[in-house]
């Protein structure tokens, strides 16, 4: 397995992955701004045949006196699940967060997935509120 930074040419496969994993709109293309944002890193996991198996992204947020990493959109194609692809992607994003001097890494998840992230060292803290626009 190879973990690398996503390229703009990966966007159509990443869109398919997001559709499968999260049920996103199939007609909505990936934004090129996502790949050009200097505070965002998207990693992909690729097998030995060059197939994209999963992806995850890190968004750096500069606060007043410190920086945090936000992990988003961790997804693995169903046919590749159970091979620690998500774990490897998350661990790489955690390393990247440390290299970027983040004091913490946060993520949002469904309640069904809590134990998955707890095994990686994450703990439930606070409660996120959201207003969909």
Predicted features by range, described:
Residues 23-43, 57:
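Active-site rim helix/loop that mediates acceptor-substrate recognition in acyltransferases
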Residues 97-109:
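Conserved GNAT acetyl-CoA-binding A-motif
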Residues 44, 51-60, 70, 75:
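Conserved beta-strand in the GNAT
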Residues 1-28, 49:
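Short amphipathic alpha-helix that is part of the acyltransferase structural core
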Residues 61-71, 81, 125:
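A conserved beta-turn-beta hairpin within the catalytic core of GNAT-like acetyltransferases
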Residues 76, 82-95:
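Conserved acetyl-CoA-binding loop-helix of GNAT-fold acetyltransferases
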Residues 87, 103, 111-133:
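Conserved active-site alpha-helix within GNAT-family acetyltransferase domains
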């Amino acid at each position: 397995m190879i973990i690398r930074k996503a390229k703009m040419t990966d966007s159509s496969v990443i869109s398919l992955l997001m559709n499968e994993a999260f049920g996103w709109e199939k007609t909505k293309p990936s934004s090129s701004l996502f790949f050009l944002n200097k505070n965002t890193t998207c990693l992909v996991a690729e097998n030995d045949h060059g197939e994209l198996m999963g992806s995850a992204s890190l968004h750096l947020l500069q606060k007043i006196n410190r920086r945090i990493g936000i992990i988003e959109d961790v997804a693995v194609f169903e046919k590749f699940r159970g091979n620690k692809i998500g774990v490897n992607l998350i661990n790489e994003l955690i390393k990247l967060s440390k290299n970027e001097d983040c004091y913490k890494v946060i993520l949002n998840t469904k309640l069904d997935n809590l134990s998955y992230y707890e095994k990686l060292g994450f703990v439930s803290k606070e409660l996120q509120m959201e207003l969909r626009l």
